[in-house]
């Protein structure tokens, strides 16, 4: 009797593939957007703690504001416990301040940027990421993303001054398979991944050694367990005669 393929097990959604959401601290979002309050008031908050959330590359900062509200924020590089931050459209543009991006001077580094006011922050959120404010025009702000692409966002969108902490994290190599296993487990990835043709015949259609390596194309209506490899391809194999050099 054969075994279910990895894609079948993943689709079933067993405990191995289920996202360990109970380990998460909470969403790293800005407070609910109140235009009147955000534009006319400046709240002062204090960083109570810097925390690690399994599965997240950047740390999280627990911030408590003077009105008693708390939130988890993605901290910029250099933010420390006990440091004050400011929340408001007209807040001073200092490290950690959450401001309206339309009021940020051109050339400033920002992170955790909203595309539309109130969406909680969508851009430049991973460790070491930042965007550069390029220009303001007609209620829109041009920013340069980490990919060097220039994007237009609403000038009323919120952003954090500074670059996200934990930059250079991916430069450190894993070195051991065990490190990769723990990292994958925190993100609910299946590791290690075994090639189908390296398996036994009962575990995968491409497994076993009694037939040549590789598979025939699978039709679109193939049953689960057979639908692997080339699925309803237009063609397979090497394209012959495509790369001929033109003659003089």
From Swiss-Prot:
* GO MF annotations in UniProt: rRNA binding; structural constituent of ribosome
Keyword annotations: Ribonucleoprotein, Ribosomal protein, RNA-binding, rRNA-binding
- Tell me any Pfam family this protein matches: Ribosomal_L2
Alphabetical GO CC annotations of the entry are: cytosolic large ribosomal subunit
User: Has UniProt tagged this entry with the keyword Heme?
Assistant: no
Entries under SMART domains matching the protein: Ribosomal_L2, Ribosomal_L2_C
Q: Which NCBIfam families match?
A: PRK09612.1
Per the similarity annotation, which family is this?
Answer: Belongs to the universal ribosomal protein uL2 family.
Q: What protein does this entry describe?
A: Large ribosomal subunit protein uL2
Give the originating organism: Thermofilum pendens (strain DSM 2475 / Hrk 5)
The taxonomy runs:
Archaea, Thermoproteota, Thermoprotei, Thermofilales, Thermofilaceae
């Amino acid at each position: 009797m054969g075994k279910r393929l990895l894609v079948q097990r993943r689709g079933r959604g067993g405990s191995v593939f289920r996202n360990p959401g109970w380990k998460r601290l909470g969403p790293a979002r800005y407070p609910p957007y109140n235009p009147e309050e955000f534009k006319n008031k400046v709240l002062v908050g204090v960083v109570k703690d810097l925390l690690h959330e399994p599965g997240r590359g950047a740390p999280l900062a627990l911030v408590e504001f003077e009105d008693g509200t708390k939130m988890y924020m993605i901290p910029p590089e250099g933010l420390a416990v006990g440091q004050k931050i400011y929340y408001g459209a007209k807040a001073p543009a200092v490290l950690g301040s959450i401001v309206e991006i339309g009021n940020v001077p051109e050339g400033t580094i920002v992170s955790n940027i909203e595309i539309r006011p109130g969406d909680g922050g969508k851009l430049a959120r991973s460790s070491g990421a930042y965007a550069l404010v390029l220009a303001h025009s007609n209620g829109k702000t041009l920013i340069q993303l980490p990919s060097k692409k220039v994007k237009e966002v609403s000038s009323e969108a919120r952003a954090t001054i500074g670059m996200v902490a934990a930059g250079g994290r991916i430069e450190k190599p894993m070195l051991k398979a065990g490190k990769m296993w723990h990292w994958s487990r925190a993100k609910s990835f299946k590791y290690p991944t075994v090639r189908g043709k390296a398996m036994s015949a009962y575990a995968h259609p491409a497994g076993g050694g009694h037939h040549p390596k590789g598979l025939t194309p699978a039709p679109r209506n193939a049953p689960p367990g057979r639908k692997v490899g080339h699925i309803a391809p237009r063609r397979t194999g090497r394209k012959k005669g495509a790369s001929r050099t033109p003659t003089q």
